[in-house]
Amino acid sequence: MSQEFDYIIVGAGSAGNTLATRLTEDAGVTVLLLEAGGPDYRFDFRTQMPAALAFPLQGRRYNWAYETDPEPYMDGRRMECGRGKGLGGSSLINGMCYIRGNAMDFDGWAELPGLEDWTYLDCLPYFRKAETRDIGPNDYHGGEGPVSVTTPKAGNNPLFHAMVEAGVQAGYPRTEDLNGYQQEGFGPMDRTVTKNGRRSSTARGYLDQAKKRPNLTIVTHALTDRVLFDGKRAIGVTYLVGDSEERVEARARKEVIVSSGAIASPQLLQRSGVGPRALLESLDIPVVHDLPGVGENLQDHLELYLQYACTQPVSLYPSLLWWNQPAIGAEWMFNGTGIGASNQFEAGGFIRTRPEFKWPNIQYHFLPVAINYNGSNGVKEHGFQAHMGSMRSPARGRIQVKSKDPRQHPSILFNYMSTEQDWQEFRDGIRLTREIMAQPALDPYRGREISPGADVQTDEQLDKFIREHAETAFHPSCSCKMGTDDMAVVDGEGRVHGMKGLRVVDASIMPLIITGNLNATTIMIAEKISDKIRGRKPLPRSTAKYYVAGDAPVKGKPMREVKQG
């Protein structure tokens, strides 16, 4: 059985749903959207309630639950690499932080040959196009887009305000909008949540407006086996439905677009015969095109938590107790309000640790409870924590297919903490975080340091803590990078080098990881490239002003000095 469409999109995630929605705005264009996971069940609180964000990571229904190979610089730990499975992709299970990256990230991309139209001012109109911000549009934010963005409001947890004030007291800037004129500094953090308190995944935002169109066909539980080629032209795909071993074939008249994410996109290309020749030949995969960069240049954000006891009963600790959860769930279900309606990452910041960094190299997420991101190891008392992570590690990893079997996970290695810069940034980051947490704004709340613990002071002690406790921020990217050099996989429009009718459009095509969470930027990339595919003129460049640190000092004098080992 074979079906024919103009475009086949592999992966209904942040990029794939955006592309499917935009391409089918043209009524004469037919699109097949394939998703290996299931629907985004709207009555499943695990994916729809913002405060329940840890639940999908604990199971396999919505999570691919990849693991890395033993990471050599992390005591050989096999580390989590959760990715979303189901309509919405990772936007169905992420932390819902709406952060776009720093303007300098995109200006840096645009300095690379062939990527001249990826400057921040070229990208900003597409960020705005995708967004509806609840407090209204301005030069930086949209008011008519599919992605619902909610801003923190007065009356939220007092710890958010105290942690931002502590950052300012430590000598860093205050910013009212981490996606506006100035990212650098501390301030409120927007979230992809609807006005009714539901997760704003791309399934809800984009597919809800597109799924009834007669020119869009969506198939869930459809695991793409490989891309089919006629010479160097992509002509279709084969896929498996559910547990069946029968391969279904679909043909593409125009293009196959791979939007499977930074892990699965290179895996699919390699399995289809597009990738490093030696790897493919070692697995008896017929080589369609020797493209050495497929699966290389893999990047991520690593982070750790600094946890503190809270001396006042204002943290979210009571919400972790089962007997309080029915009332929280009921308020969220019927009113769309309360603790359940927030991801609880309502404040954060970006700082530079040293003058050689021209824009922030450390990100903070503040959380008014002490618990692991995946919901494990909750501290059994009132507490709060700062998630601290480096933004642009020089470490580079890789994805390698292990077999022709589409159900076998690939070999994943990030090489976390493999450079001296990594260690310097994390040591600096821990010490600067302690200085922030010691400021007067937190005096009414701060108890003992739970983790790492006040006795962890020397470089050696900090390094041991980092090796044992640092975790992924779940931001894999850059494994099919845009560019023109020998290791580039696609051009500035996502077209695979040396091939015809084949694109990759998702976080894997970022040439360098951005300063912040990836979801908003992945959607922007898909919005921008969809105009290219449709032959539309790009949106006019923005004229908005944006902050460049230049010679500005990294920080001012802290209100309270802290002596550390």
Curated annotation (Swiss-Prot):
Give the cofactors, semicolon-separated.
Answer: FAD
Q: Name one GO molecular function term.
A: choline dehydrogenase activity
GO BP terms, alphabetized: glycine betaine biosynthetic process from choline
InterPro entries under this entry? BetA, FAD/NAD-bd_sf, GMC_OxRdtase, GMC_OxRdtase_N, GMC_OxRtase_C
- Keywords recorded for this protein, A-Z: FAD, Flavoprotein, NAD, Oxidoreductase
Q: Show the active-site residues.
A: 475
What family is this?
A: Belongs to the GMC oxidoreductase family.
* The protein, known as: Oxygen-dependent choline dehydrogenase
* Gene, per the UniProt record: betA
